[in-house]
């Protein structure tokens, strides 16, 4: 019995710590540095996520960042599923740990991204119908309004109802709520700009980032 308990605790520790360390990998920073685009923390909003990497003008690096940030959520969930034979509580903890790792990466003094790509990676690997529904929501909102943050916030709000509709286990529903709350907290500045009608459209720079107008000719 003691051996079984030790194995269970070890498995839990691997799922949580492993998920967090995976989530902490700053793909945006790695991609921009290796790709010659500089330090992403000094570009645009300073965020390490794919949306800000796109502001560097490098769509290839933004795509790499998106895949990497989503992929670490996928790997964390699949690892937990393999280790526990599909235990929904451990899977939710591993996915949540990867998500927290992206938001608060140990390698960057706990200053990370907003978690949207990792959120989708966790959803797709833990319950793919929910991930597809949330992704479709993002695409629809982005197409209609051309505002990335609004699309992400809408998808986050609807993730738990989607989980309920697809009859997912309670730990996964709790994970959806947990991630949605943190996504809203991390997007508080975006929400303030949305309320003022100042949130930039997809592909547009923030007003503060735009070059000042040229002076009139004498």
Curated annotation (Swiss-Prot):
<keyword id="KW-1003">Cell membrane</keyword>
<comment type="function">
    <text>Catalyzes the transfer of an acyl group from acyl-phosphate (acyl-PO(4)) to glycerol-3-phosphate (G3P) to form lysophosphatidic acid (LPA). This enzyme utilizes acyl-phosphate as fatty acyl donor, but not acyl-CoA or acyl-ACP.</text>
</comment>
<comment type="similarity">
    <text>Belongs to the PlsY family.</text>
</comment>
<feature type="transmembrane region" description="Helical">
    <location>
        <begin position="165"/>
        <end position="185"/>
    </location>
</feature>
<keyword id="KW-1208">Phospholipid metabolism</keyword>
<keyword id="KW-1133">Transmembrane helix</keyword>
<dbReference type="GO" id="GO:0008654">
    <property type="term" value="P:phospholipid biosynthetic process"/>
</dbReference>
<keyword id="KW-0997">Cell inner membrane</keyword>
<dbReference type="GO" id="GO:0043772">
    <property type="term" value="F:acyl-phosphate glycerol-3-phosphate acyltransferase activity"/>
</dbReference>
<keyword id="KW-0472">Membrane</keyword>
<feature type="transmembrane region" description="Helical">
    <location>
        <begin position="88"/>
        <end position="108"/>
    </location>
</feature>
<feature type="transmembrane region" description="Helical">
    <location>
        <begin position="10"/>
        <end position="30"/>
    </location>
</feature>
<keyword id="KW-0808">Transferase</keyword>
<feature type="transmembrane region" description="Helical">
    <location>
        <begin position="60"/>
        <end position="80"/>
    </location>
</feature>
<comment type="pathway">
    <text>Lipid metabolism; phospholipid metabolism.</text>
</comment>
<keyword id="KW-0812">Transmembrane</keyword>
<dbReference type="InterPro" id="IPR003811">
    <property type="entry name" value="G3P_acylTferase_PlsY"/>
</dbReference>
<feature type="transmembrane region" description="Helical">
    <location>
        <begin position="125"/>
        <end position="145"/>
    </location>
</feature>
<dbReference type="Pfam" id="PF02660">
    <property type="entry name" value="G3P_acyltransf"/>
</dbReference>
<keyword id="KW-0594">Phospholipid biosynthesis</keyword>
<protein>
    <recommendedName>
        <fullName>Glycerol-3-phosphate acyltransferase</fullName>
        <ecNumber>2.3.1.275</ecNumber>
    </recommendedName>
</protein>
<keyword id="KW-0443">Lipid metabolism</keyword>
<dbReference type="GO" id="GO:0005886">
    <property type="term" value="C:plasma membrane"/>
</dbReference>
<comment type="subunit">
    <text>Probably interacts with PlsX.</text>
</comment>
<keyword id="KW-0444">Lipid biosynthesis</keyword>
């Amino acid at each position: 019995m003691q051996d079984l308990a030790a194995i269970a605790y070890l498995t839990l520790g691997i799922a949580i710590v492993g998920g967090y360390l995976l989530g902490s990998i700053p793909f945006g920073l790695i991609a921009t540095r290796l790709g010659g685009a500089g330090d992403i923390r000094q570009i645009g909003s300073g965020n390490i996520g794919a949306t800000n990497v796109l502001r560097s003008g490098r769509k290839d690096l933004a795509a790499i960042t998106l895949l990497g940030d989503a992929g670490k959520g996928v790997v964390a969930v699949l690892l937990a599923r393999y280790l526990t034979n599909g235990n929904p509580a451990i899977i939710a903890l591993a996915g949540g740990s990867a998500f927290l790792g992206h938001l608060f990466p140990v390698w960057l003094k706990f200053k990370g991204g907003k978690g949207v790509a990792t959120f989708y990676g966790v959803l797709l690997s833990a319950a793919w119908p929910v991930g597809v529904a949330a992704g479709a929501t993002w695409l629809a909102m982005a197409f209609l309004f051309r505002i990335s943050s609004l699309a992400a916030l809408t998808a986050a709000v609807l993730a738990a109802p989607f989980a309920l509709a697809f009859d997912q286990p309670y730990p996964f529903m709790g994970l959806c709520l947990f991630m949605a709350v943190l996504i809203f907290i991390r997007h508080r500045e975006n929400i303030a700009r949305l309320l003022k009608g100042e949130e930039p459209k997809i592909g547009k720079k923030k007003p503060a980032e735009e070059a000042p107008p040229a002076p009139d000719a004498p």
